[in-house]
Amino acid sequence: MIIGTFILDFQTIDFEPDAKIAVDMLSDYQRLYQLENSFALDPPVQSLGWSFAKMFLAGRFVEKIYAHQAFKIEASKGKKLEDKFVAWLQKELKNRGCSAQIKIAPEMKSI
């Protein structure tokens, strides 16, 4: 399975704590799978009390996570792998207290 880079929209009304939860969780997975520089969260743009940022996940990173979490990811909502992965990631973040909403960015859909 070859997966390209995931480009996600990260939207929240409380950027700093939500971003910290997301970065900490992804850093833990990155360490677990012995990878480096496998994700990025851009600085946010503020609008009407919301913060909007782009999150990038390297394809290899997504593949490693999927290999170890396939059962949970496959049980998530969605028809395509990308949708299931994002639904799983959203749930994992929520379980850790992150209130951000994530979704596949239009830039990823057009690739």
Residue locations for each model-derived region?
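Short, extreme N-terminal segment that most often corresponds to the first beta-strand
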Residues: 1-26
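Broad gene-expression machinery/nucleic-acid interaction feature
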Residues: 3-7, 52, 99-103
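A structural detector for beta-sheet-dominated domains
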Residues: 9-11, 56-58, 103-105
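Residue-level signal for secondary-structure boundary sites
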Residues: 16, 63-65, 110
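Extended Gly/Ser/Thr-rich low-complexity repeat segments
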Residues: 21-28, 64-88
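Short secondary-structure junctions
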Residues: 29-39, 94-98
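Short, intrinsically disordered low-complexity segments
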Residues: 33-79
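Conserved short beta-strand edge segments in small beta-sheet-based binding/regulatory domains
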Residues: 73-110
